[in-house]
């Protein structure tokens, strides 16, 4: 009898031990529910922030940005810039290896920047690197990068999520297929990519930072439906979800096991007006439309309070951003200006959106109603990614059907050049970049170009302010709001958060 009890005790102990081991393993596996799918795992060939964010599982850059969008060293220890602003010399950390065992060194950096700056590779992020004349490996830990002309924002380009260090061995092995075979220096390596369902990454045992990563795996799971994404948190199917639909935020906030986070962002939402087309070529019309929109009401109706009215064309947390007195809501003034512009009865136009999710739909409906109150009839269209690529990003000024266009921009370099030049410089009309207002002002172009030729912060401040002053006065946009980024996570998950550019930070994430 005693023997039988002893055996059952051993069995019970074995079961308990197995369960404990199983739970311990499961406790280190995190599922992240995200709003859309991934296009590629090659950061240099991804136009979407989400793909670049997931690629941070595998990849690191020479530099990065912290939560305040300030520059930090990652694979680099330091850098210097020549007096003429042409040459950047970067000192690298020693003793780091890629996940395939290849040494990380100056030769590896050269291989990556040579690839990125070669137009023959047709990489989507080529515009970031087109100013590189040559990259030289001076010794194993020293890289010299020579530019074609001074470009004072270049160090921020090296901190952009696209500027990832890929194993040169893997680049040679996989070539154009590298987007399916990521090999970097990051804390995780690829486990599985089911292209219709999820990306799973696992701990890289040879990671160069001691004690990291703390998780065994992360599964990135695209969940397009807002309600399903929120429900996965409540059932425990996911430990982190982003974005959280504004209408679900209050419900999740009441759940004692979930923490809701509303983080600052650099995501500015705006409506561009095609200034090469009537009636938007008339400054009074553009001014009228800015008076016609009640931004505080828009914050409540479309964003459930998780946004702030825009105070400029560059979000406040971006370096060299200028703030102005927000446009007041004044429909009477709007009608007066329309009358002065020759449109006493208003006019008809189109209003397109770059996205078709629920928040974009609400913005379109709200704006349509606001414009109707001053006599403007707007036919609205919420586009999917394919429509946007074909009708907006892929057509030049003569072919473009863009009139009013609701969209957003996140300057992931954290610096004013990438917040201004792609959106307002004359050379950046579609299909080159994203100046969907087809705005052109020689003074603005000159100020932006001059700002890139100086490393003097005071001079850069003066030049960027001058450019923003003109843009604000000429109003090719209706600046709307700067979003707050709403995410939610299980309370036992720590160290996992959203960056201001909508990317993720998770290097020291852990489950308690």
UniProtKB/Swiss-Prot annotation:
InterPro entries in the cross-refs: Peptide/Ni-bd, SBP_5, SBP_5_CS, SBP_5_dom
Record-linked CDD domains: PBP2_Ylib_like (cd08499)
Subcellular location: Periplasm
MF GO annotations: peptide transmembrane transporter activity
Family matches, as Pfam families: SBP_bac_5
Keyword Transferase: no
Oligomeric and partner information: The complex is composed of two ATP-binding proteins (GsiA), two transmembrane proteins (GsiC and GsiD) and a solute-binding protein (GsiB).
PANTHER family documented for this protein: GLUTATHIONE-BINDING PROTEIN GSIB, PERIPLASMIC BINDING COMPONENT OF ABC TRANSPORTER
Protein name: Glutathione-binding protein GsiB
Organism for this UniProt entry: Shigella flexneri
